[in-house]
């Protein structure tokens, strides 16, 4: 069984923020594939399923998302290598997309929570959201909406990442990485 997790914060206040790009990708996948909602309170998230594939949007806040993922992982007996986490990354320019297995949290509190609850060797789909001018602005930056110019590209970016995630269901990580990685939004056709 494969588990795709989109990181984000619950509630309409955060819906279109940089931090919620992972939720947008999960929404796209669920819509494209027609996955059905199988959520239960115990999962602490919106959980969808189609065949042997699960899609999770934790409804805990970002900093606590590891608990939701751990619960789903244990309930469905999912191996760590079958978990794919989609998240924002301020260390990448807007629109960049990178894939890797394992690694550090890079200051991302959602990943920090995840690492503490399930370990580090899951696949990460990192989506660049750009970086604020000063480190002290990071929290405000990721909790704000994209700029008008960026907003125009979000739908295409989300579709690209969604297609990459679908490819991960049947292709090797390195093959997906070589085809779907982007250095910036300009690389998106």
Swiss-Prot record:
- What positions are marked as the site Discriminates between blocked and unblocked aminoacyl-tRNA? 9
Keyword Cytoplasm attributed: yes
Q: Where is this site: Stabilizes the basic form of H active site to accept a proton?
A: 88
An example molecular function term from Gene Ontology annotations: tRNA binding
Q: Kindly identify the residues recorded as the active site.
A: 19 (proton acceptor)
- Which CDD domains is this protein grouped with? PTH
Annotated transmembrane regions: none
Q: In which domain of life is the source organism classified?
A: Bacteria
What are the GO BP annotations of this UniProt entry? protein quality control for misfolded or incompletely synthesized proteins; rescue of stalled ribosome
Primary location class: cytoplasm
Query: Recorded E.C. number(s)?
Result: 3.1.1.29
- The positions annotated for binding tRNA are 14, 61, 63, 109
Please provide the record's keywords in A-Z order: Cytoplasm, Hydrolase, RNA-binding, tRNA-binding
Known catalytic reactions: an N-acyl-L-alpha-aminoacyl-tRNA + H2O = an N-acyl-L-amino acid + a tRNA + H(+)
Q: Which GO terms describe its cellular component?
A: cytoplasm
Enumerate the subcellular locations listed in this protein's record, separating them with semicolons: Cytoplasm
Q: Which InterPro entries match?
A: Pept_tRNA_hydro (IPR001328), Pept_tRNA_hydro_CS (IPR018171), Pept_tRNA_hydro_sf (IPR036416)
Please explain the role this protein plays, according to its UniProt record.
Answer: Hydrolyzes ribosome-free peptidyl-tRNAs (with 1 or more amino acids incorporated), which drop off the ribosome during protein synthesis, or as a result of ribosome stalling. Catalyzes the release of premature peptidyl moieties from peptidyl-tRNA molecules trapped in stalled 50S ribosomal subunits, and thus maintains levels of free tRNAs and 50S ribosomes.
Could you tell me which PANTHER family the record lists for this protein? PEPTIDYL-TRNA HYDROLASE
Q: Which family does it belong to?
A: Belongs to the PTH family.
What quaternary arrangement does the UniProt entry report?
Answer: Monomer.
Question: Under which name does UniProt file this protein?
Answer: Peptidyl-tRNA hydrolase
């Amino acid at each position: 069984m494969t588990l795709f997790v989109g990181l984000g914060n619950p509630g309409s206040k955060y819906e279109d923020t940089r931090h919620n790009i992972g939720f947008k990708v999960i929404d796209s996948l669920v819509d494209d594939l027609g996955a059905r909602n199988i959520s239960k309170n115990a999962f602490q998230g919106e959980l969808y399923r189609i065949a042997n594939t699960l899609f999770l949007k934790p409804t805990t806040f970002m900093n606590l998302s590891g608990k939701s993922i751990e619960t789903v992982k244990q309930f469905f007996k999912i191996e760590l290598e079958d978990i794919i986490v989609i998240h924002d990354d301020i260390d990448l320019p807007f629109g960049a997309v990178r894939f890797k297995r394992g690694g550090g949290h890079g200051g991302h509190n959602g990943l920090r929570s995840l690492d503490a609850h399930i370990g580090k060797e899951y696949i990460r789909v990192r989506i660049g959201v750009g970086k604020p001018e000063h480190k002290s602005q990071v929290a405000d930056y990721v909790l704000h909406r994209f700029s008008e110019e960026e907003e125009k590209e979000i739908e295409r970016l989300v579709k690209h990442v969604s297609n990459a995630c679908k490819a991960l269901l049947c292709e090797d990580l390195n093959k997906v990485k070589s085809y779907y990685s982007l250095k910036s939004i300009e690389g998106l056709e």
